Amino acid sequence: MTSFELESPIEIKTDPTDLDQESDSFVQEISRFNKALEQRFRDKMRLHESLSRKIVSFQANKSKPQYRWFKYKEAFSVDLVNQLIFEYEKKSFERILDPFAGAGTMLFACSDAGIQADGIEVLPIGQEIIEVRKIIQRQFRREDFLRLIEWYKQKPWNQHNNRKYLNRLRITDGAYPPETEASIERFLFSIEKENILVKQVLRFALLCILESISYTRKDGQYLRWDKRAFRKSGSDKFDKGKILDFDEAITEQIKLILNDSFDLISNTLFCYGTQRSGINLFNASCLKILPEFEQDFYDCIITSPPYCNRYDYTRTYALELALLGVGERDIVQLRQDMLSCTVENKEKSLIHNWQEALRILDKQELLQSILRFLERELERKKLNNNGIPRMIKGYFYEMACVIIECFRVLKNGSPLFMVNDNVRYAGIDISVDLILSNIAEEIGFNVEKILVLPTGKGNSSQQMGTHGRKTLRKCVYVWRKP
């Protein structure tokens, strides 16, 4: 018996409202439309015991060689990909797509299984992680590994006082202790003497440790600052604990890359009994790239889009983006290019390419009732940010465009697996799983299953403070093109 036979029906009991809102006509309308979708998908919802939060997040990758190099917390695990490919589908694929590739978990898992993997990623940090892993797997030579060993042993950045300027953003200024910043700049100067491949891998090693040697910690929507930081925005109370010494952190990271790479070399030709396949990465927004793809081309799509949770990756990964040379104007453009999941996103022009998707969204009753409620709350000054209604509208309208393109590029009979979370704003639960599944159905997909995790997630700390803690569904959607 496989883990995907350990499913059980689940009774949906979504109460999208607070008790003190029940008499509100806007809220009553939301509740009515929500219950209608619950009834529509009642037979598709399945509680899945093996889908823990660990397996649908980065946590399960922390012990996996290569996957553990960079802690990309928004990723799902390689174990999830293997479950979906080998246990759920139980058939061979030639080519799989991830339109939100992130750190490339799906790409490398499929490549190791002998499946051609294509990905699209807009953020430079994800692009860099994928590129460096490809370099180490496919281009690094024996002498390149020997150079890494020399760096590990000799610490050449400590043998001179020359420095290369560390790029900064307003949000990253003052992020490191002065002695750490000096070490970083000596390190950057030293790597300039290496060949382009060794240089890129060494810079990646530095990229992997930036948070651990800084005054900052990634905290959902922003960077949280330690009280020891020399800036006014640092918290008077927050103490992130030990800030690692630069030499200790960078040598341990180089050692980790070497150890995992030696394991890679010893197993380089065969994994799952087949030769590793190619990886293609397209560096841009999937809204730009997907329309360029051939119709009926992919055997499967496995993806996890950004959640509609206000997380701004240009802030949480600001240290890494600065090291990669991203400037202030680039940050503004990146925020606009990304899927609308932050309050700073401006409305995108979608009307020329996706009129059918927009028509479907305009008729989606639950979403439209939620948008009317949020606009009313905005007028009443009840929202903690005025950009929330625009963000939520943009998120679903853009996701509809992505879904319609995914439908177009999939072969007949092929599945789309999507990991996503429900969210809550202004005391209202937004059933992302039901809304997106309804959109997918209108586009032409068969909604095969909505696999629900046994334990959901809490709403944001802001929501808890005003409306109390409430568990929200976390799911893996399974849609299939007929």
Curated annotation (Swiss-Prot):
It catalyses: a 2'-deoxycytidine in DNA + S-adenosyl-L-methionine = an N(4)-methyl-2'-deoxycytidine in DNA + S-adenosyl-L-homocysteine + H(+). InterPro entries: MeTrfase_CN4_CS (IPR017985), SAM-dependent_MTases_sf (IPR029063). It comes from the Bacteria. It is an enzyme of class 2 (transferase). Keywords: DNA-binding, Methyltransferase, Restriction system, S-adenosyl-L-methionine, Transferase. Its EC number is 2.1.1.113. GO terms for biological process: DNA restriction-modification system; methylation. GO terms for molecular function: DNA binding; site-specific DNA-methyltransferase (cytosine-N4-specific) activity. Belongs to the N(4)/N(6)-methyltransferase family. N(4) subfamily. This is Type II methyltransferase M.AvaI. It comes from Nostoc sp. (strain PCC 7120 / SAG 25.82 / UTEX 2576). The gene is avaIM.
